[in-house]
């Protein structure tokens, strides 16, 4: 059984809320990738209660990223649920200090697995 911290961002208001999910709801997320969408109802959420404002019931949640249990960020260009060291010049997991700087960094792949601790999602309105 997996346990995830789910950070849900509302792009209209700019508010983000963090909730913890376990059990069957968390297992529905395993195997999904960054960029995939899932119905909020499928996870058993009432987003109007969580955010305290009126949010329609037919919204989807789009996975935008996350981190694993050791804090390594997920990258959309690394496929699979694995952790790898890659040479990167920009993007998630690296902020260059100089122009043209590249470094070898450890990152996590784009697929959700039980080793993921936090999943970032945003609300996609119909």
From Swiss-Prot:
User: Which PROSITE patterns does the UniProt record give?
Assistant: RIBOSOMAL_S6E
Q: Which GO terms describe its cellular component?
A: ribonucleoprotein complex; ribosome
**Which InterPro entries does the record associate with it?**
Ribosomal_eS6 (IPR001377), Ribosomal_eS6_arc (IPR020924), Ribosomal_eS6_CS (IPR018282)
| Source organism superkingdom | Archaea
Q: Give yes or no: UniProt keyword Ribonucleoprotein.
A: yes
**Alphabetized PANTHER family for the sequence:** 40S RIBOSOMAL PROTEIN S6 (PTHR11502)
Tell me which NCBIfam families the record gives: PRK04290.1-2 (NF003293), PRK04290.1-3 (NF003294)
Any idea what this protein is called?
A: Small ribosomal subunit protein eS6
Organism, as annotated: Thermococcus sibiricus (strain DSM 12597 / MM 739)
């Amino acid at each position: 059984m997996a346990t995830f911290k789910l950070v849900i961002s509302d792009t209209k208001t700019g508010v983000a809320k963090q909730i913890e999910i376990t059990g069957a709801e968390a297992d529905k997320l395993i195997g999904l990738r960054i960029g995939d969408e899932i119905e909020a109802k499928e996870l058993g959420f009432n987003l109007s209660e969580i955010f305290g404002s009126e949010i329609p019931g037919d919204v989807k949640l789009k996975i935008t990223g996350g981190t694993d249990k050791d804090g390594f960020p997920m990258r959309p260009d690394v496929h699979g649920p694995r952790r790898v060291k890659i040479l990167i010049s920009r993007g998630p997991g690296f902020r260059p200090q100089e122009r043209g700087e590249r470094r070898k960094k450890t990152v996590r792949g784009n697929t959700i697995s039980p080793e993921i601790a936090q999943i970032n999602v945003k609300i996609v309105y119909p």
